[in-house]
């Protein structure tokens, strides 16, 4: 339980600047259309892309529907594939193919509305990870999964969030592996935060919620951030965690 709570701290820190409780369909005018590619262009690209490799996910990049992110995850898996064992190599190949096929098969049903399209991609991603046993792969390939589960170079990345949440649903041992990998990359400050959070135990019946901080701790913005960590993609806010940053920035530009 402590390991899972510690991993939640990663969401807390990485999502602070990117999360606000807004309606996903009204978050920003940018969600109403694609920038470089129209919906028909995106659909055509997806239908013409090969299911093997990262071509399918390249079709999702650079759009105002904020569907960027899966291409980066795909490349991370491919770059680290050689370090996985046989089970892991199979997972890399089959999970990417599963997600690509799932997204392509449902694109025409969902692409007219950004929120529905985003949610569909995340649901397909989570379903493929679960079906192909991402937890077992992470347990038997701790170093390789640690290379994959690193902070993305560009935010927001809602699909990185889905990857982390899929691992967070695993057993304690797997969660501990993911946590250790993130701490190693984020440095001693993250380890200190884990310790602060893990040393603060709330008794049953306490009024303290998950945003309560240990004595002496101050949130950088004066109050804890508001965000959602949801156990399943079913009914999940498609703009969770990192996904809202660009929408908020765009809204601010419009209001200036």
Swiss-Prot record:
Principal location class: secreted
Biological process per Gene Ontology, one example term: intracellular calcium ion homeostasis
GO cellular component: extracellular space
Subunit and interaction comment: Homodimer; disulfide-linked.
Pfam families assigned: Stanniocalcin
Localisation: Secreted
Protein name per UniProt: Stanniocalcin
Prosequence residues removed at maturation: 19-33
Function: Its primary function is the prevention of hypercalcemia. Upon release into the circulation, it lowers calcium transport by the gills, thereby reducing its rate of influx from the environment into the extracellular compartment. STC also stimulates phosphate reabsorption by renal proximal tubules. The consequence of this action is increased levels of plasma phosphate, which combines with excess calcium and promotes its disposal into bone and scales.
Signal peptide stretch: 1-18
UniProt GO molecular function: hormone activity
Family membership: Belongs to the stanniocalcin family.
InterPro entries assigned to the protein according to its UniProt record, in alphabetical order: Stanniocalcin
Species this chain originates from: Oncorhynchus kisutch (Coho salmon)
Keywords: Calcium, Calcium transport, Disulfide bond, Glycoprotein, Hormone, Ion transport, Secreted, Signal, Transport
Residues with glycosylation annotation: 62
Tissue: Produced and secreted by the corpuscles of Stannius.
């Amino acid at each position: 339980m402590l390991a899972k709570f510690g991993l939640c701290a990663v969401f807390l820190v990485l999502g602070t600047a990117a999360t606000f409780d807004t309606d996903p369909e009204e978050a920003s005018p940018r969600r109403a259309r694609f920038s470089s590619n129209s919906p028909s262009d995106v659909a055509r690209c997806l239908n013409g892309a090969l299911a093997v490799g990262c071509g399918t996910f390249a079709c999702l990049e650079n759009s105002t529907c904020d569907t960027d992110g899966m291409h980066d995850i795909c490349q991370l898996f491919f770059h680290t594939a050689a370090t996985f064992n046989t089970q892991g190599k199979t997972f890399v190949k089959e999970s990417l193919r599963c997600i690509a096929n799932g997204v392509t098969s449902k694109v025409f049903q969902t692409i007219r509305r950004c929120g529905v399209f985003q949610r569909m991609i995340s649901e397909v991603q989570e379903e493929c990870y679960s079906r192909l046993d991402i937890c077992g792969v992470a347990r038997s390939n701790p170093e390789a999964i640690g290379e994959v589960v690193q902070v993305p170079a560009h935010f927001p990345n809602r699909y990185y969030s889905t990857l982390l949440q899929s691992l967070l649903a695993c057993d304690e041992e797997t969660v501990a592996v993911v946590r250790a990998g993130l701490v190693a990359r984020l440095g001693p400050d993250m380890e200190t935060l884990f310790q602060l959070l893990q040393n603060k135990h709330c008794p049953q019946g306490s009024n303290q919620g998950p945003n309560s901080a240990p004595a002496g701790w101050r949130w950088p913005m004066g109050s804890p951030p508001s965000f959602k960590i949801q156990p399943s993609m079913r009914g999940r806010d498609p703009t969770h965690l990192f996904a809202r940053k660009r929408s908020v920035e765009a809204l601010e530009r419009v209001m200036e």
